[in-house]
Amino acid sequence: MEPIHNPPPQTCSYSRPSTTYTSFKDASCDTKVTRIIIALFLIVISCGLILCAYTFRDLLDADYLAQEGPQQATKLLQQLDDVLTGPPLPIWDNEHLFQFSCLMQNKHRRVLPIDICNPLTKFNFLECICNCLMTKQSVNVNETDMCELFCPPTCTPENYRRLLCTSSVFPFVMWHDPSADTQEAMLTKMDQTMSSGRVGNSHWVLVIVDIEYRCVTFFDSLCDYVASPQQMREQLEGLAVSLGAIYPKEGGADSDQEELLSPFQVRIGSTVKVQSPGEFTCGAWCCQFLAWYLENPDFDLEEKVPTNPSERRALLADFISTTEQAMSRYSSLSWPTTD
């Protein structure tokens, strides 16, 4: 009997596939193209996910964006552009406004300097303007005694009377802070701002009453910071009616009474923003507007002011630099004389 020989057990050997990694430089042309396509595909997918995330975030922030106002990105870009255009322009406050109005009085003679000791706000400016114009009317007809005449602390009653008699253009500046909702709150905010030495949310706007031209002109360098142009027009139309009664038109005995008492014209000097975001140049813009008005009351602001922010800034910077030295003669805040 022959022995049985069992065959040796068979073993399975698995060969591990060899993986060779090559650098992009050493890879074949087909491999390079494949890798580039994959990379671009991943970039596109990543960008899509990012955009989806931003869209979802915008939906979450919809209420916040509605409160803050539209075009936030545009405003941020404008502010960045303003920061990059150069050093900040000087801040012109009430003293600068007074000094410049004195300079204009010396040049044009028919301008009454701005009374900075009697602050105007949106709550009292209509009454204050009417009182000033009524005082001029009574002075013209010698109905006001020297003792009854209210005049600024840095001006004598005699000099103030002479200035009133010779003036026909009356510029008024109004101080505004949007956080104040009453006259008392506005004055308190004004004192706090002056004490802190910071501008905060404060803003200057200009009202020009021209008796000869029979016109009331309002200028806001931010266009709608105090109120919308239409709202300001409605308020000024009430003032225009009062001024028409104080200063009726000249006419003969047979002139129509209603025509003689016709209201002054109302002009909104700016329907676009000329003050760039992030700048505190409202005072300087008020002075520039007054200078242009005295040269030509019918001038068009949009024709004077460049649309490019850098050019607009350069224009105002040139105005400030050429005016500050001449204004310095009135640094004592004493009113100019008519002698």
From Swiss-Prot:
Residue numbers annotated as active site: 203, 220, 282
GO molecular function: cysteine-type deubiquitinase activity; deNEDDylase activity
UniProt xrefs under InterPro entries: Papain-like_cys_pep_sf, Peptidase_C48_C
Keyword Membrane: yes
Keywords: Hydrolase, Membrane, Protease, Secreted, Thiol protease, Transmembrane, Transmembrane helix, Ubl conjugation pathway, Virulence
Gene3D superfamilies: Adenoviral Proteinase, Chain A
Keyword flag Transmembrane helix: yes
One Pfam assignment: Peptidase_C48
Residues in coiled coil: none
EC number, UniProt record: 3.4.22.-
Residue spans crossing the bilayer: 36-56
Gene Ontology biological process terms from the UniProt entry: protein deneddylation; protein deubiquitination; proteolysis
Any one GO cellular component localisation term in the record: extracellular region
Subcellular location as annotated: Secreted; Host cell; Membrane
Topology versus the membrane: Single-pass membrane protein
Protein family (similarity comment): Belongs to the peptidase C48 family.
Annotated function: Effector proteins function to alter host cell physiology and promote bacterial survival in host tissues. This protease possesses deubiquitinating and deneddylating activities.
Name of the featured protein: Deubiquitinase and deneddylase Dub2
Top-level taxonomy: Bacteria, Pseudomonadati, Chlamydiota, Chlamydiia, Chlamydiales
